[in-house]
Each structure stands twice: as C-alpha cells, then as structure tokens.
Design a protein with these regions (language model features):
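Phosphate/pyrophosphate-binding loops at sites that engage ATP/ADP/AMP, CoA/4′-phosphopantetheine
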Residues: 100-113, 262-277, 328-332
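Claisen-condensing/thiolase-fold acyl-transfer catalytic domains that form or cleave C-C bonds
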Residues: 121-122, 140-142, 147-168, 257, ...
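Acidic-glycine-rich active-site phosphate/pyrophosphate-binding loop
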Residues: 124-139, 177-188, 232-237, 289-303
C-alpha cells in the first residue's frame, strides 16, 4: 500500500477581528447581572492567551450598546433563532471555504481531485458546502463527496484518517479536505460565567488541504482514538431552537491531562514523548494546552506553534489543528517525527502520528 501525505495546507479567516468587541460585549452583559462575575471574566480574559479572533459578522463601533454587530444579528435581549443563524451560515460559509481552497493554488491538480471531504459542526444545508465548492472551485463533477458533520473540534483528524484510508486503497486518489467553521454564529446571551466564556474563545476559520500518495509535505503514519470513560457530559453540542448549545465543563483540562497520561504509550506507539519533534495540538484553550504539556512532560517550547495559533485566531473548532499543521509544514523541517491531536465530545482525543517528508 502507498504511503499517504498531506501535500499542502492553506487557511483563510473572515476580515473582521472581533476579539476585543466580543470581550466588551460579554463583560458588559455580565456586569449588568453580576458585577463580581464580570470582574472574574476580565481576569480570565487577560489570561486566555488570545489576542485576535475573526468573524463573518461586522462588529459595531460600540459593542457595549444594544447591538454587538453592525447588522444587528446579536441584539441585546434578542439573540437570533436557529433558522436565522443557519441563513448566515449559508451566506458566509461558501465564500470562506472557496478562499481557503483557492489559496492551495491547485492549478492542474484541480482536475485531478477524486475525493472531497468537508467537516463542519456549525451549520448545515442541502445542497451543502460540498456542492458549493464543486461549483465555485470548478472541481470535477465526478468527485466523490463525504461530509463529516457535527463531530466538533476533532473532526479534522477524522477527515485525515478517512483520506488516509482512501489513498491507501486507491493510490491515484487525490483528496481535497475542507474544514470550515463559523463558531461565532452560535454565541448565547447568558448571565452564567461558564457559558459566557465562549465569547472569549471561539472564532471563524477555514483550512483546505490536499492529501495524496505524492511524497511531499508530511507523511501520515497512524491514528489512535482515546475515549475517556464517564465523561460524556463534559463537552456537548446540541441543536436547539435558539441556536446550537455548547457545554464546556471546567473539568475538561484535568480530564484531558489524566486521559493522555494514561494512554501515552498507545498514542505514541511506545515511543517516548521526548522523541517527538513536532507537536500539532488543537489549541482548545490555554488550559487545554497546559494540560497536554503536563501530560507528556513537554518542554515549554514544544507547543509554541499551537499557542501562537491560539493567540492569533482563537478556537475555530475543526479548522484549528490544520492551522497548526500548516505552520509546522511552512517551517520547512524535514525527516522529523510528529504527533497531532484534537479533543471533543465523548470525551475523546483523536490523535495522529506523522513525519515530515525526507
């Protein structure tokens, strides 16, 4: 069977940096209900490790006022229903996905794409984003399409796993992966501090990648899934009348740390963590990265790329780990071993061992 490679990755974000505006909107909302929680929110914001996040929504000049955004999508005390949120997804998702694919500069490879895999947990429609991309990017109409929906942050690793098996079974396959998330469409107005932390963390973004047997980029070696028992309620993502409801327990970092520590030999195929040169860890938040660092006893610099992506973009769900992989590939390291991982509902860690092409 052929070796399988991520040949290249490209990324795109919307034009609006909303981190400061979301922070001000959430802080003012909490202050009205509970000034003490508002002060705690500010301290947590200062320690989040995030400086920028991007959204398809245009922020208003005064997010402390009646509307967060210029279009009135988030009006104080009148947040949108699910149908309105999905209308915005249908409007903005195809354009952002196309931008990421175009940055791959496929050229002649465009006509050679055999498979298309799309991941998203932030919106749905039919005909969907897969067919939008075929039309917008002029892909072959015969392309085989798969949509991996509603898996959350670890969907990109599952998409890579699927592409890996496709190429191993069809050596001539050329698989286009698109990870598109518009997380900022699903914020909730709530006086609960834990719920309002989503205003500090989530963002919009898209990654596109090409996977094939061509020996360039990074080689995909193996995959492991680690399910932590009795953690089903710690991360949940449910469709409700007023949008998609997120539960993200404060226990998640500690559970991730314990689960990774117990499963380290399985994840790393018996290799010591010190032998892994490159770490592509989904930056689900600063405390999540801290938990991974402690679980594998990593050097403080080991997760520098993940921390930089968190600082520049926040958590873009399934797209985020691909932003990390793109930056590691761009660094030009060759012949080095790596480990990628993402976390999500279950609680599950989806992991992948890779190596840079010689």
């Amino acid at each position: 069977m052929p070796a399988v490679y991520i040949n290249r990755v490209a990324t795109a974000v919307p034009p609006y940096d909303v981190h400061d505006a979301f922070r001000r909107f959430a802080q003012s909302t909490l202050h009205l209900a509970n000034p003490r929680q508002a002060r705690l929110f500010e301290r947590m914001a200062d320690k989040s490790g995030i400086e920028h996040r991007f959204s398809c929504l245009t922020p208003s000049n005064r997010p402390e006022g009646d509307h967060f955004d210029a279009g009135g999508f988030y009006a104080r005390s009148d947040f949108p229903d699910t149908a309105t949120r999905m209308e915005q997804y249908e409007r903005h998702a195809p354009e952002l996905a196309q931008a990421a694919v175009e940055r791959l500069h496929l050229g002649a490879d465009r006509d050679r794409i055999t498979h298309l895999i799309v991941t998203s947990c932030t919106g749905f429609s039919a005909p969907g984003l897969d067919l939008d991309l075929i039309a917008r990017c002029e892909l072959p109409t015969t392309v085989e399409r798969t949509v991996i929906g509603f898996m959350g942050c670890y969907a990109a690793i599952n998409a890579l796993k699927l592409a890996y098996h496709i190429v191993r079974s069809e050596a001539s396959a050329r698989v286009l992966l698109v990870n598109l998330e518009l997380c900022t469409l699903h914020l909730k107005e709530n006086a609960d501090l834990e719920q309002m932390l989503s205003f500090l963390l989530f963002a919009d973004g898209c990654a596109a990648s090409l996977v094939s047997a061509e020996p360039s980029g990074i080689a995909l070696d193996s995959f492991r899934a680690v399910l932590v028992p009795d953690t089903r309620d710690l991360i949940t993502w449910n469709i409700r009348d007023a949008g998609f409801d997120m539960v993200l327990s404060g226990r998640v970092p500690a559970v991730i740390q314990d689960g990774l520590r117990r499963s380290a030999d399985e994840i790393l195929a018996g290799a010591p963590a010190a032998s892994i040169d490159l770490w592509a860890v989904h930056p689900g938040g600063r405390t999540v990265l801290d938990a991974v660092e402690r679980a594998f006893a990593l050097a403080p610099t080991a997760l520098a790329t993940s921390r930089d992506v968190l600082r520049r973009y926040g958590n873009m769900s399934s797209a985020t780990v691909m932003f990390v992989i793109e930056r590691l590939m761009r660094s030009g390291a060759r012949g080095r071993s790596g480990c990628a991982m993402s976390f999500g509902p279950g609680l599950i860690a989806e992991t992948m061992l890779f190596r840079t092409a010689a």
